[in-house]
Amino acid sequence: MQPGPALQAVLLAVLLSEPRSSKGRLLSGQLVCRGGTRRPCYKVIYFHDAFQRLNFEEAKEACRRDGGQLVSIETEDEQRLIEKFIENLLASDGDFWIGLRRLEVKQVNNTACQDLYAWTDGSTSQFRNWYVDEPSCGSEVCVVMYHQPSAPPGIGGSYMFQWNDDRCNMKNNFICKYADEKPSTTPSIRPGGEATEPPTPVLPEETQKEDTKETFKESREAALNLAYILIPSIPLFLLLVVTSAACWVWICRRRKQEQPDPTTKEQHTIWPTPHQENSPNLDVYNVIRKQSEADLTEPRPDLKNISFRVCSSEAPPDDISCDYDNMAVNPSESGFVTLASMESGFVTNDIYEFSPDRMGRSKESGWVENEIYY
């Protein structure tokens, strides 16, 4: 049975009897049925937020889950009825999906583009309300009902409520239509004798709330997983920081210990400073002062004279006997120089004898350093 003027009047009466907002208008998603319960029924889904609107397939699925289909407008009277619903919403700019779509078949030469469109709910109605230059039959396959109150009229007049083919991935509002049969309220009986409640239709608003809850739940689980990873790594990070700091301190101390002390370096110099050369407090002077005259003159049998022998001119340059020998005292003519007395073992600095052959160059190479042997 096609909706006629009588049905339009009934639906408008039902619309007036339905719950309304404080402004007295139809609510988005409100179910409007003939007589309040009889079908066909309609739901006009309008979103103020454009980001919440759906593409064609999403709108079709939302209607299907709610027990209906995208609306099939089969007569001009039904077209006017849908227009009244939308006007009563006081909706702003935003087109509405309807259940008309172009078939995915190759166009035959003698087939008009308009003839390739069919209703998704299986209706065979040939009623169309295209705008003057529509459909364009390009990449735009799905169909919307124009709703642009702010748009100026085009070359074919006002765009309002005219049909236009559009890309199926565009985001729009939509209209659902429910079957002509009376909805069943009697619970079904299972084979085991248990009664089951009829399925509760899922509204688009409820679906969005469920999707929001699922998204929030997934985000929370991801945050917990991240926390489970980061919390155990905090002690390891602190241990790494402490270990690095300890190693740095140890290396600094090691380098500081390896660096020579400037005061110690000055004490190890070979030549004493001029002030130290003339100082009467040197250890050697203190030792000499403690020696008595008897220590310097009396012999000591337990000590040997330590002598250096100067090489003669006949000896070869590499003769090791020219270096030094610890031998008994020889006459001064033999070329030995007595450095220590038998008594004290200190240098007397009295005798420096050289061989006659080396007298000529004694100033250059014959000098014997005074050493102290105790």
UniProtKB/Swiss-Prot annotation:
The modification Phosphoserine is found at S279, S292. GO terms for biological process: positive regulation of axonogenesis. Residues 330-374 are annotated as: Interaction with TLN1. Sequence repeats lie at residues 333-337, 343-347, 349-352, 364-368, 370-373. It is found in: Membrane. Residues 25-221 are extracellular. Its main location: membrane. Widely expressed. Abundant in the ovary. GO terms for molecular function: carbohydrate binding. Disulfide bonds join C63-C176, C142-C168. It is a single-pass type I membrane protein. GO terms for cellular component: cell surface; cytoplasm; membrane; ruffle. Residues 37-177 form the C-type lectin domain. Residues 184-212 are annotated as: Disordered. Residues 333-368 are annotated as: 3 X 5 AA repeats of E-S-G-X-V. Keywords: Disulfide bond, Glycoprotein, Lectin, Membrane, Phosphoprotein, Repeat, Signal, Transmembrane, Transmembrane helix. Receptor for hyaluronate. The C-terminal domain interacts with the N-terminal domain of RDX. Interacts with NF2 and RDX. Interacts with TLN1. This is Layilin.
